[in-house]
């Protein structure tokens, strides 16, 4: 009897054996290091003495951290809505092109089917290309475009000899401008991030769009629903589960913009693009591990609260 119960337990819990390696990996490379970071945030780096919340107070009062936190928040608030809206529009456009290709296939219109499929393939190549470009290549592109002797300045000087807008540009730009050291640097950073991760979000939106049954659209079309009504009452409500994932991943990806900025402008870039990662990098170089640990815990707490609130609001509306 005991042998039978033992066999039943083994059959009931086979999933734990598959989850164990994953749990060990997350613990070794995630949970345990984070617990050590939390511990270090309450101790001084030099002598290892316990200082309580002193490190947190120093971080909050630090001017560099305050500037970086404001810039990072501004960057996320600006980038995420632009990225989500633009990627959703392009994903819906691409989905419509694929639907038209399927309709032409049913009507045996080979020429138009090939045209639509070719257009879809061209769109996919355009939005997936930035994902394949290494960060070092993006940095080279930035320097070619926005350096004081780069393409943008050359183009403006070429236009300065023309009438109208050329004269205006010649008045505004009397010398070569290093665009990454001006207020325009923030806009360049936003554009670069959206350009880099646009394809990533389009792929996620496409996964959600392809999961919506086409029969719903056909039934709505038979009932006289137009494109706008099907978009607002069918497409967007069915994309809610995917939207949660897209928002979270987009926010996490926004912290990866530091690589390009650091490689272009170094540890102390123009103040509008001085991000939290710059603070962490500078503190790491000066071995201020206690401050860096406290700031990391604070950032992790803010992100966790944001994710929980977002998840709660999603569940409440569903």
Where are these regions (language model features)?
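Short Lys/Arg-rich cationic patches that frequently serve as NLS/NoLS or arginine-rich RNA/DNA-binding motifs
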Residues: 1-9
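A structural signal for multi-pass alpha-helical bundles of membrane permease subunits
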Residues: 8-318
